[in-house]
Amino acid sequence: MNTNVPIFSSPVRDLPRSFEQKHLAVVDAFFQTYHVKPDFIARSPGRVNLIGEHIDYCDFSVLPLAIDVDMLCAVKILDEKNPSITLTNADPKFAQRKFDLPLDGSYMAIDPSVSEWSNYFKCGLHVAHSYLKKIAPERFNNTPLVGAQIFCQSDIPTGGGLSSAFTCAAALATIRANMGKNFDISKKDLTRITAVAEHYVGVNNGGMDQATSVYGEEDHALYVEFRPKLKATPFKFPQLKNHEISFVIANTLVKSNKFETAPTNYNLRVIEVTVAANALATRYSVALPSHKDNSNSERGNLRDFMDAYYARYENQAQPWNGDIGTGIERLLKMLQLVEESFSRKKSGFTVHEASTALNCSREEFTRDYLTTFPVRFQVLKLYQRAKHVYSESLRVLKALKMMTSATFHTDEDFFTDFGRLMNESQASCDKLYECSCIETNQICSIALANGSFGSRLTGAGWGGCTIHLVPSGANGNVEQVRKALIEKFYNVRYPDLTDEELKDAIIVSKPALGTCLYEQ
Amino acid sequence: MDYNKRSSVSTVPNAAPIRVGFVGLNAAKGWAIKTHYPAILQLSSQFQITALYSPKIETSIATIQRLKLSNATAFPTLESFASSSTIDMIVIAIQVASHYEVVMPLLEFSKNNPNLKYLFVEWALACSLDQAESIYKAAAERGVQTIISLQGRKSPYILRAKELISQGYIGDINSIEIAGNGGWYGYERPVKSPKYIYEIGNGVDLVTTTFGHTIDILQYMTSSYFSRINAMVFNNIPEQELIDERGNRLGQRVPKTVPDHLLFQGTLLNGNVPVSCSFKGGKPTKKFTKNLVIDIHGTKGDLKLEGDAGFAEISNLVLYYSGTRANDFPLANGQQAPLDPGYDAGKEIMEVYHLRNYNAIVGNIHRLYQSISDFHFNTKKIPELPSQFVMQGFDFEGFPTLMDALILHRLIESVYKSNMMGSTLNVSNISHYSL
């Protein structure tokens, strides 16, 4: 596996599939806007998560894949004394933006109180700038970054990793523009710096999106691990006898803007799982480590609790190393402990009850857990969230085990077995993590009734995209699933959709290549 | 939170940027270089610095060179600066003590500039109510849109609190308490601190600035002026000890005539709500308490705003909300109400709103400039938007004007008057006087 972000250049050869048609269009659009040709294009794909939702920020592994839709940033470098960035979006709903770069080499200010599309570019620019200051401090500590004209074009649906792909492409574009053609950045570095990019707009996320976008490989799913070190391992799908494996990605068209709903959804879940980890640690008298390097884990997480528990009670001083058999055993134990600790409070914990469970005052609890990101809630549902995280992590290991060692008597065995895990994941997301919505559930029901073997939400949820495991090829069900979704969901829920919109709402995809550069 | 969404229309206008002339921008020191300049830098498509004035032209020339203001000209006299047609907006960022003597002739000279549309003055407007009223009249006669930097109104926490109150999340307000710490007015004075801020009459003190910004924020959040007030002002620390940068005493005592304590009580016009407020000077005690607390109690919930210093307008606050509100389901745009919303209408909702990376010193001024730009370019496509408006009052949109400043100055004048007379004053007409 190549460890560096790949670079392609003309003449056109071996381009990733999804890029072949689009790069010409974005160059044309760039020329129409700025009347010059771009120097390069930074590309980052969207992603779907096969299984393993909302466990990455607890440092559990996930099984995503990059898909055939992407964010393209075409860039023309400007060598000016007063450098500025001009951003144009192919979608006219997102207005052009222009801002100057600080002349003294300080960081661009990002206002986290405003929901604004160019802020995601600024996040990518910020983390790239931070990286450049580390690798070349004499050059970047006191002088500005170079200016640029940038055209941004994307067909990634909301919920399909759009914001993460944008920050990855923006970071890569910034590094390429400032370090020149011959500089190679490793996938590991790009993933590491972009994993925290969205924190600068107040969105707390875990890094899985960025890892998938960067590490994606054609025809492979990725097994993304966060501990002990961030690592993405491609796994080829099993070779089946009479079918191919395809994924139908159906967009609910419910737009859950991560920034605006974070206080009741995403940010709140992060706090709930953190509080759950600390409540378990208090109950079983173990100390959770504090990871200062990663602001997601300042107060420990559910994986930390698992490791601490096994160190104290099972004499396993070494943290879990990712081994499948050991992991399954430990996760089953964790689920047992969650039942023992939280099942009497399935209706949720008030602030008073949560602080009591942590042996601290309400004021300490509020200061330590609630002021990191905006949040809004009635009760903290520690039982449901902890159970989801551990059981979902268990399903990921079972899925990986299935992909690596199982043999199937018939193709249907694979589809049935893998599909069951996906369906269990959807049930857990809906009932325990409460990140589904009516539209997601409707789409899953319709797909399952018409040929999908596994259907679930993908991405953060609360709208966005769904993913469906469907046999393709001569005997496949892809077209059947598509038609059923159109007739029973889209025509009912969104009767005014145009054919173009329908085409964009349902994507049939195989795994795609990750982030790359295309030199003009 | 609709009010914090950026306009969906372009803020890269097809028209030319607003050309800004500064009185008081110095690259080496001062408030403008820390706040106004970085704010404008983030809005470079909408604002461009084209002129600088300082009594010593060398200061302006050095600033232009250091900041690389390639479009800016240094002017030797106030008259030539004010007369220049290269300026659309003038920003006054100098000591309050000089406001009157600079702004009055500037407005007169500016009659030679047909392009002047905006006058932006730092709070406080001037040293006294009389001066503030004179400036207000002169600006109104000159015919410019005015802005006062009561930038706390643009804080995302204040806007969120205002939103929660206006949408009924705390029901009707029944009481309010404020406690704050005003910083420089205690037993010690840094030797580098400018002398004028410790002398009464220069327009900068615990009442005009610390109390002024905070009480304006309170009125704005609650959408109410006061009906009655009672205040006591103290100068219990008439001498201060000088200290160096490391906090060591220099053995020298200097006089202080500005107040170090304020006790303020009042009732809001809306709902006859009692408000109690105390401010004190001195070194903040970070270990034991917050140095700014605003508590707003309602029939259905409570709001608390906390800050590390008594300057709400430049602090990264934390907003806490706790309360009940029926039929409150968080919905994504266009989403139908879920069958099982997961919210129990009878249970208490808790919200904690804090943005860890928000730089309030620059951010609130930046959002003020953004509002000016939105107004100038009509980025929200408001039909028949007037070219000028008199005051923001309690609107979410727009920006505070000299009329808003004048109303606040009247309240502050009443604080001193109440202290002197030792009586409760009726201030319910404070926003009604015509000039």
UniProtKB/Swiss-Prot annotation, chain A:
N-acetylmethionine: modified positions: M1
Induction per UniProt is: The GAL3 gene is a member of the family of galactose inducible, glucose-repressible genes (which include GAL1, GAL2, GAL7, GAL10, GAL80, and MELI).
Listed PANTHER family: GALACTOKINASE-RELATED (PTHR10457:SF7), MEVALONATE KINASE/GALACTOKINASE (PTHR10457)
**Known role:** The GAL3 regulatory function is required for rapid induction of the galactose system. At normal induction, galactose in the presence of the GAL3 protein may lead to the induction of the GAL genes, including GAL1. Then the galactokinase protein (GAL1) in the presence of galactose may reinforce the induction leading to a higher expression level. Upon depletion of galactose, the inducing activity of the galactokinase protein may decrease, after which transcription of the GAL genes, including GAL1, may decrease.
Superkingdom of this protein's organism: Eukaryota
Pfam families (UniProt xref): GalKase_gal_bdg, GHMP_kinases_C, GHMP_kinases_N
What keywords were assigned to this record?
Answer: Acetylation, ATP-binding, Carbohydrate metabolism, Galactose metabolism, Nucleotide-binding
Query: Which organism is this protein's natural source?
Result: Saccharomyces cerevisiae (strain ATCC 204508 / S288c)
One Gene Ontology term of the biological-process aspect is:
maintenance of protein location
**InterPro entries recorded for this chain?**
Galactokinase, Galactokinase_CS, GalKase_N, GHMP_kinase_C_dom, GHMP_kinase_C_sf, GHMP_kinase_N_dom, Mevalonate/galactokinase, Ribosomal_Su5_D2-typ_SF
Report if keyword ATP-binding is assigned. yes
Into which family does the record put it? Belongs to the GHMP kinase family. GalK subfamily.
GO molecular function, a single term: galactokinase activity
Keyword Nucleotide-binding (UniProt): yes
GN (gene name): GAL3
| Other comment | Present with 721 molecules/cell in log phase SD medium.
Protein's name in the database: Protein GAL3
A Gene Ontology CC term for this entry? nucleus
Curated annotation (Swiss-Prot), chain B:
Give start-end of the signal peptide: none
* Transmembrane segments annotated in the record for this chain: none
Q: Name one GO molecular function term.
A: DNA binding
Keyword ATP-binding assigned to the entry: answer is no
GO CC terms = cytoplasm; nucleus; transcription regulator complex; transcription repressor complex
Q: Which residues carry this modification: N-acetylmethionine?
A: M1
Alphabetized UniProt keyword annotations: Acetylation, Carbohydrate metabolism, DNA-binding, Galactose metabolism, Repressor, Transcription, Transcription regulation
Task: Tell me yes or no: is Disulfide bond among this UniProt entry's keywords.
Answer: no
Q: Name one GO biological process term.
A: negative regulation of transcription by RNA polymerase II
Which family, according to UniProt?
A: To K.lactis GAL80.
- PANTHER family from the UniProt entry: CONSERVED EXPRESSED OXIDOREDUCTASE (EUROFUNG), GALACTOSE_LACTOSE METABOLISM REGULATORY PROTEIN GAL80
Function of this protein? This protein is a negative regulator for the gene expression of the lactose/galactose metabolic genes. It binds to GAL4 and so blocks transcriptional activation by it, in the absence of an inducing sugar.
Description of how the protein assembles with itself and partners: Monomer.
Tell me what else is known: Present with 784 molecules/cell in log phase SD medium.
Name of the protein: Galactose/lactose metabolism regulatory protein GAL80
Gene that codes for this? GAL80
